[in-house]
Amino acid sequence: MPSMPFYHRPGRALRPLTARASAPAARRVETPVAVSAAEVGYAVIDLETTGLSPARDRIIEIGLVLLAPDGSTQSSWTTLVDPGASVDVGPTFIHGLVADDLIGAPGLADIADLLVRDLAGRAVVAHNARFDVGFLTQALGSLGHLSRGARIPRVCTMELARTYIVTPSRRLVTCCEAAGVPIGSHHCALDDAHASAGLLRRYMSVGRERGDGPVAWSRSLESAAAFTAWTWDEAAART
């Protein structure tokens, strides 16, 4: 388990970082080699942010769940993120966080190598992936961890909802209710990431029952295996 200072929401028990599946080796490589199909998987992510604009706003909480290609959970972690002393935390009525909650939390630059290592070789899954991937692209690109113009392979559980479940709305809570997927505290990053992972597994199950051919998530694994735009320091990811 890394010694990195992960910070969690007040009143929530610390979840230890469990052993991760191996990621493609890298020591600050500028062009990582493509990984084999056997090494890929999914990185289900949820971000809580100070607002809606990747260019202007900041990430203040990350929840990440790593899945094998069959959808089984491999590991998960979460942390609060300090956006900087002069940054307003934004809509507390949505994410439930105030400035004092983020005191002492790592900045994104402090955990970026770990985050990128865990994303590498995986298709990024999110509910409203355009939002979360937009923030990842802006934030990690500005830190030099993602090549300019690169399009992160992604799967959007919100876009796929009406193909695989019957739901009156594509909101995460509504989709989970329709799919029978448990959800913890909505807008708590790790709980929402686990909920999105549950939706993906439900879609996989429905797809198998219907005899669907290659679908969005399986094609995304091929894209993830060939994606070479990440850069990270393996030593920094372990400290």
Where are the regions a protein language model picked out?
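Acidic two-metal-ion nuclease catalytic site recognized across multiple nuclease folds
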Residues: P2-A34, G198-T239
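Buried hydrophobic packing segments
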Residues: L136, L160, S196-L200
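A short, hydrophobic secondary-structure junction motif
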Residues: R162-Y164, F227
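Conserved non-catalytic scaffold segment of RNase H-like nuclease domains
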Residues: R12-I152, I165-H187
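Acidic, divalent-metal-coordinating active-site segment for phosphoryl/phosphodiester hydrolysis
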Residues: C188-R202
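Low-complexity, compositionally biased segments
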Residues: V116, F135, H194-A195, A236
